[in-house]
């Protein structure tokens, strides 16, 4: 090995020493892997979950304070071959009769050139499948939305986190509430179902900011909001550093046991009452409406995300 050839551990790329020094050299990544569904699992998941999942890209260049993706997948974005993705979809349709696919990229609309090429490939190969993905409210225009819709896009799950600009800045987001409104309108105009996933009471999300988020939700049309309280603290994130400074966690805490950051003035019941008073579709994790999805999935054989049935004008 490297040591037998006289190389020290500090000379080996991506190797860490006990004192925290990392190996030198250029970081390397695995080449694009073969995209293929596992035959023994495909039928089970299609029946039970109503969709299959596939990844089109790995890596995330964003700076969200709570997110572990950059440290797990790297910050360099690597994409899969669109032809291989299309071929795999066609094979799954033929062998299992699937009609819905969810692209599990951390953020789908990173790299517009690649996404356009992927959508054009899906159209050219006539995959004729409905699909959804996680989107950022920033980085999509009307032309792209129309193309994605033509390629089968039916559901967008926006990682919005807040409808308050001050909180978005504190969370390390690269978009504003204005971007959220524009992206929502683009989806609505093209007939694409969309939902907003929110983190309330996270780092920097004050009581006043939460109230602004709830009030701004009145401006969202034909959608559903899924709010979550606080942030899970993961190692190697900015949130972990901030939480340690505030004494919320120890500096040597390995965070193997789940730890969460929740603003001191966050009141879940107050938030719940204010959200429901808007008349909009706010679905909290313990909401009885969540059981509707199980009923539709198992008893009526509905496919794809089922939150579209929870939307309100």
What are these regions (language model features)?
Residues 26-38:
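Conserved ATP/PPi-binding loop(s) of AMP-dependent carboxylate-activating enzymes
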Residues 62, 113, 166, 170-171, ...:
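Flexible glycine/acidic-rich beta-alpha junction loops that bind and position SAM and/or redox cofactors
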Residues 9-10, 99, 130, 195, ...:
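Acidic/polar loop patches that form or flank catalytic/metal-binding clefts of enzymes
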Residues 4-7, 174-175, 213-215, 243-247:
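Short, hinge-like loop/turn segments at secondary-structure boundaries
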Residues 35-195, 200, 215:
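Radical SAM [4Fe-4S] cluster-binding motif and immediate context
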Residues 19-20, 237-313:
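Radical SAM enzyme core and accessory elements
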Residues 1-26, 228, 232, 236:
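Glycine-rich beta-alpha loop elements in corrinoid/cobalamin-binding modules
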Residues 116-122, 206-223:
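Short, electropositive alpha-helical surface patch
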């Amino acid at each position: 090995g490297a040591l037998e050839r006289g190389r020290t551990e500090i000379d080996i790329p991506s190797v860490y020493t006990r004192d925290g020094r990392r190996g030198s050299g250029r970081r390397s990544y695995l080449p694009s892997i073969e995209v293929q569904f596992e035959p023994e699992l495909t039928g089970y998941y299609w029946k039970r979950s109503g969709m299959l999942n596939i990844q089109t890209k790995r890596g995330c260049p964003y700076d969200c304070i709570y997110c572990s993706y950059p440290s797990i997948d790297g910050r360099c974005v690597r994409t899969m071959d669109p032809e291989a993705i299309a071929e795999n979809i066609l094979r799954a349709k033929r062998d299992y009769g699937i009609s819905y696919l969810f692209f599990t990229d951390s953020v789908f609309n990173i790299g517009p050139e690649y996404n356009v090429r992927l959508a054009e490939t899906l159209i050219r190969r006539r995959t004729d499948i409905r699909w959804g993905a996680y989107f950022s409210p920033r980085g999509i225009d009307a032309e792209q939305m129309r193309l994605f819709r033509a390629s089968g896009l039916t559901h967008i799950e926006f990682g919005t986190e807040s409808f308050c600009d001050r909180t978005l800045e504190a969370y390390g987001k690269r978009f504003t509430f204005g971007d959220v409104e524009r992206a929502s309108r683009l989806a609505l105009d093209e007939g694409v179902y969309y939902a907003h996933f929110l983190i309330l009471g996270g780092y920097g999300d004050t009581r006043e900011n939460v109230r602004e988020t709830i009030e701004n939700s009145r401006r969202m049309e034909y959608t559903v909001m899924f709010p979550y309280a606080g942030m899970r603290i993961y190692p190697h994130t900015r949130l972990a550093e901030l939480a340690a400074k505030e004494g919320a966690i120890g500096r040597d805490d390995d965070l193997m046991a789940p730890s969460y950051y929740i603003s001191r003035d966050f009141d879940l019941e107050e938030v719940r009452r204010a959200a429901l008073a808007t008349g909009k579709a706010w679905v909290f994790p313990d909401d009885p409406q969540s059981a509707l999805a199980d009923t539709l999935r198992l008893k009526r054989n509905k496919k794809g995300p089922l939150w579209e049935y929870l939307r309100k004008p």
